[in-house]
Structure formats: structure tokens, C-alpha cells
Amino acid sequence: MFQNGLSSSPSNTTEPFSGPNFPLISIRDNVKAGYKLVTEVFGVKRIYGVVGFSMGAQQAFQWGVSYPNFVEKIVGIAGSAVEYPHGQVRLEGFIAAIQADNSFNEGNYNSPPEIGLRAGGAHWASWGWSQEWYRQGLYKEMELNSPSDVINWFEEFVLTWDANNLIALARTWQNNNVGNTPGFNGDYSKALKSIKAEVLYMPSETDMYFHIEALTQEAEKIPGVKLRIIPSLWGHIAGAGFSSDDAEFIDQEIKEFYK
């Protein structure tokens, strides 16, 4: 995915598009690049399945809209086809946490803005899992002993990333909307109804990034959809494989879907 530090990203692109000057990339841009790769480089004529978690799920749904005759089956795990207003505000909070560090210097930093990155990690720690996950102390299943340990865990994770890369990814996430695909004039309902692939739509019951009500409404608009809600207290992280129960549920549903 663009901006992840491996593909073209603010951290590895030369001037004039390096750092904070990196252009806004859409989910659709990522999917278009993937399509060109598999068709022009590998000569693939049709894809049997696309599977994605979180921003990968955003891409999976976009594959179905952008290339309706190219993909047979789509699995979207804990992700949406549209980023709704509350999610956009939440992401702005994450971005603001990083930018509040004086050493961020509008993205022109000489060393990682560690204070801002840690603040971003603390932000994510409050959103990644459900309230009940914290109340029941399920963090102990990750060999963590307290909510403070969870914050430290997420801070250390965020510190492994480049700040401009994270902000660029957040902007991509903020602006996601399959309705912006050419031909749909911003109408995401129409875009979802155009999907011809079979779709396994798997939201997490307690996801605080992608709210279950919005996702079930999205699923209802897709003609060939199979909605399977992950019955988990792990929030968004239910799709990341940390819980063996969640991983087993997801694996079994995908196996059944691909029969």
C-alpha cells in the first residue's frame, strides 16, 4: 500500500514530493496500481478472491466497484466502503496528536517527533479495543497487565512508523468513499449496488473505528453479500488475529465462503 514506508511514501520519495509534500493518495489509487501490477506485469486475467482487513477491507470493496468483472469473491474484515464523519473526526484527532509535537515542524523534522508519535499511540489505544475489553481485562491475553501496558504497547508500535507516512495514510483513510469512483458522482449506495462479486462482509461487533450500524447498512446495499458479524469484544483488533477465538471464526467463515 502506498505510504506504508515500503511502497512510494513520504519517507522514501525524493523532492519535490518528499515528506509533507507527498500528494494525497486515495484507496482507489492503491487499487488501480494493484490492478496494473497484476494485469500488466503478471498477466492475470481474473482474480478469484480479494481479502483485506481494515484499510485492506477498504481496498477490497473498491476492487469490486472499480473492476466489477475482474474479481469473483471479496472478503472485507473490519473495514468499510466509506469513511463517515465521526471516523473523519477521530482520524483528525490522531493527526493533531502527532502535529502538536514542536519537533514535527510541519513535517520537516530532522529526527522522529517522538512525543507526537507517542501521543498518537495513546490515541489509538483508546480506540483499538472495546470498552468491555478493557473492563474485563482481556489485555491479559496479550500478556499485558494493565491499561497502561496497552498504551505503552501501542506507543511502541507507532514509534516504528514515520510520522509523515502515518499522516498520509490517515488522510487516505479519511477520504475513502467508493462513491467517488468515476461514474457514481459521490453516490456510494449506487457504487455498492454495482458490485458483481460475491462479498463476505465481516464487521466486528464492537469496532469503534467502523461502527457496526453503518457497516450493516452498507452490506445491505451489496447484491451478492453474505454478512457475518464477528462476535468479539476485541473491537477493531478482532480482525488482526490477536484473539484465537476471533481468528478461528474468521478462518472458518472464509473457508466456507471459498468452497
Give the role of each language-model region.
Residues 1-59, 65, 69-81, 86-91, ...:
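Gly/Pro-rich cap/lid or specificity-loop segments adjacent to the active site
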Residues 70-156:
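Alpha/beta-hydrolase-fold enzymes
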Residues 78, 96-103, 121, 202, ...:
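Detector for conserved single-position "signature" residues within domains
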Residues 153, 168-191:
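Active-site nucleophile elbow and catalytic-triad environment of alpha/beta-hydrolase enzymes
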Residues 184, 208-214:
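Conserved alpha/beta-hydrolase "acid-adjacent" motif
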Residues 192-196, 220-223:
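Short, conserved loop/helix-junction motifs that constitute active-site signature segments
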Residues 195, 201-203:
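Short beta-strand/loop motif that positions the catalytic acidic residue
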Residues 216-220, 224-259:
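Catalytic active-site module of serine/aspartate enzymes centered on a nucleophile-bearing elbow/loop
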